[in-house]
Amino acid sequence: MAWGNFCIVPCPWRIWDDTSRKQMLAMLPVLGLLMGALWYGLAELLLWLCIPKMLSAAVLTVYPFFVSGFMHLDGYMDCCDAIFSRAPLEKKKQILKDSRVGAFAVIWVIVLFLMLFASVYSFIEADASYMEF
């Protein structure tokens, strides 16, 4: 159930009942481990295919957002709009419920992607042998 809610990769099990719902929270670390393993596998594949470092960094930057269906990115953008609006509390609550994207959301999502890209690229650039055991 956690896999189906938090990941776009198809899940072969489709059990949606109260028992599964109660266990979903306990399965989130397992889901994170699986998604991280897929991320690592993608990095290994890009390294094995000799994909240029810049392109590899771009793909690895987008992967965690893509595999989660961009769900967390949407929440991040909503929060940035509300927090940086410098509006009263009631107005911030309205901003959180608003489906439109504001300027602060756009600015901070660009900052987020640039920082993540720079981190991934510098990690790859430093030495790609980090993936070897």
Protein language model features and the residues they cover:
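Hydrophobic alpha-helical transmembrane segments
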Residues: 1-69, 80-93, 98-99, 105-133
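Glycine/small-residue-rich loop that forms an oxyanion/phosphate-binding "nest" at active or ligand-binding sites
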Residues: 74
